[in-house]
């Protein structure tokens, strides 16, 4: 099936458009309810891969607000969609080797939770973004654009590197693009040593 890797970029460029990519089924349901109540256009991307649910039933989704899933101060890993689960797994693996990564679920790409991004930059000093999207125009670029003008810190983007989407099982596609917890761990170790 078709793999769209540029939808966030296209939707972010439309004035007034809200762009959301929930991390699990509970958040997806809450995001649909929030989108229904929102007075304006909303683009809501749903992934095809089932991921474990880590939000509690009754979770209240707030457009434009991210959430810290795991505390840490060595580095912040900001993710959305199914990559949030991969980032959480990476955070656990990094903790086991003494790296304390803050994991952030940033389901709203536009408007970006600039307050939380700034907090991560100030408290962690380095940021990695993770998304199932092109590194051009998505979450990583939104974070970089904001920080370049407010509080420049090193940022590494993990995503699809300027390629068209490919077909295969979800696991095959994620592996082909390096969108896995294992890859996040390796990138984090290298990035922290720069």
In which residue ranges do the predicted regions lie?
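Conserved thiamine diphosphate
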Residues: 1-37, 192
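Glycine- and acidic-residue-enriched helix-capping/beta->alpha junction motif
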Residues: 35-41, 143
